[in-house]
UniProtKB/Swiss-Prot annotation:
This is Protein TCL1B4. PANTHER family: PROTEIN P13 MTCP-1, T-CELL LEUKEMIA_LYMPHOMA PROTEIN 1B. It comes from Mus musculus. The lineage of its organism: Eukaryota, Metazoa, Chordata, Craniata, Vertebrata. Coiled coil: none annotated. One of its GO terms (molecular function) is protein serine/threonine kinase activator activity. It comes from the Eukaryota. Belongs to the TCL1 family. InterPro entries: TCL1_MTCP1, TCL1_MTCP1_sf.
Length: 120
């Protein structure tokens, strides 16, 4: 009898994320998410068209830094203050922009969401 391979169970992505600090968001379960990386590129693995692509990498963190870095204040100030999950793979920002959930994974215990600005 062959052993079956078991993969860790991924929780559902958050229903909403509310900005509590410049680069920190909180979900409906009180979990903290940090905007770890923002990429702006015309050549991205997430973009299929030739256009500017904005992707945000959010990491669920159990321990946060006390103070935001000065660089994050400049880099992330254009992100929406709130994201709400509208469908299985689309978030709507407080600014009415749509963000596509392109990846929800876990790597070495860190849960990650990758959102891409959808240019509808």
């Amino acid at each position: 009898m062959a052993d079956s391979v078991r993969f860790p169970c991924m929780p559902f992505p958050p229903c909403f994320l509310v900005c509590t600090r410049d680069d920190i968001y909180e979900d409906e379960h009180g979990r903290q998410w940090v905007a770890a990386k923002v990429e702006t590129s015309s050549h991205s693995p997430y973009c299929s068209k030739i256009e500017t692509c904005v992707t945000v990498h959010l990491w669920q963190m159990t321990t946060l830094f006390q103070e935001p870095s000065p660089d994050s204040l400049k880099t992330f100030n254009f992100l929406p203050r709130t994201w709400r999950l509208e469908s299985r793979n689309t978030y709507r920002g407080a600014d009415a922009m749509h963000w596509r959930l392109v990846n929800h994974s876990q790597f070495y215990g860190t849960e990650e969401l990758v959102l891409m600005l959808d240019s509808r």
